[in-house]
Amino acid sequence: MATAKELSASSNVDNTVVGPSILISGRLTGDEDLTVRGRVEGELTLSRTLIVEPSGVVKANVAVKNAIVSGVVVGNINATESVELTREGRMVGDIRAPRVIIVDGASFRGRVDMGDVEPGRLPAERPAVVRPTAVTRPTATPARPTIPAARPMPPPPPSRPTPPPPPARPSAPPAVTRPSAPITRPGLGGLGSKPLPPPPPTRVERAEPQAGQAGSAEPPTPVLVGAGAKKKVVVKKKTR
């Protein structure tokens, strides 16, 4: 396949150029190379190569042998050999070609169809890349933080001292009993008062012995009389 430089060098012989100030609208066909520096709209069919310069704009469905896009293409490109998008190329559409080159920096939005694989030209199997096994490093288990000791409970607030009970009021002194005044008898004149005589002693009566006990030899029980009392004896005569 011819590169872009080779196509541009050979295009000096049979090459048609659409200048920057030219606008072609409609259907365009030809059997030679076409370089677009202006604007082409419609449908483009060539048996040779289409070259879109950085200043060129093509808004058409293109059917060519080779296509080199350095400008802007809006439409589908169907090439029998190759399609190349350079670094300055911008394309929106689908590409159908057996070989497609998209250089780093190009902008493309669409689908690419490179056809069926020819028999006898199966893609060579890529050698298996041996990737180094990742070395597993022992993961150090982080030590668990020690649980801080429980904070000591604050001491209870001091209890307020119980106020002492109020002092007991002193009880009133007992009333002093004054001795009663001596009773003076009326009619005694200037004589001094005399104390009253003591009350008479209690009269004690001796129980009489029963008839069956008259002849007993026990002497009668003497009667005790308090000191200062007069002794009074009562004698009863037995009636026969």
Curated annotation (Swiss-Prot):
* Stretches for region Interacts with PadC: 116-240
Q: Which GO terms describe its biological process?
A: chromosome segregation
Q: Which UniProt keywords apply?
A: Chromosome partition, Cytoplasm, Cytoskeleton
Q: Where is the composition biased (Pro residues)?
A: 151-173
Positions of the UniProt region annotated as Disordered: 117-240
Query: Nuclease: is it a keyword of this entry?
Result: no
Subcellular location as annotated: Cytoplasm, Cytoskeleton
Q: Where is the composition biased (Low complexity)?
A: 126-150
**Extent of Basic residues compositional bias:** 229-240
Against InterPro entries, the record matches this protein to: BacA/B (IPR007607)
Q: What happens when the gene is disrupted?
A: BacO forms single filaments from one pole, mislocalization of ParA and of ParB-parS complexes, nucleoids are more compact. PadC is found throughout the cell. In a triple bacN-bacO-bacP deletion ParA, ParB-parS and PadC are also mislocalized, nucleoids are more compact, DNA origin regions are mislocalized, DNA content increases. The triple bacNOP deletion is synthetically lethal with smc or double scpAB deletions.
Q: How does it assemble?
A: Interacts with BacN and probably also BacO, the 3 proteins colocalize as an extended structure. Interacts with PadC.
Which family does the record assign? Answer: Belongs to the bactofilin family.
User: What task does this protein carry out?
Assistant: A non-essential component of the chromosome segregation machinery. Positions the ParA-ParB-parS chromosome segregation machinery within the cell; BacP seems to be the most important bactofilin in this process. Forms a heteropolymeric, subpolar scaffold in the cell; BacP probably forms the core, BacO contributes to position and integrity while BacN does not seem to contribute to assembly.
* Record's protein name: Bactofilin BacP
What organism does the UniProt record list as the source?
Answer: Myxococcus xanthus (strain DK1622)
Which gene underlies this protein? Answer: bacP
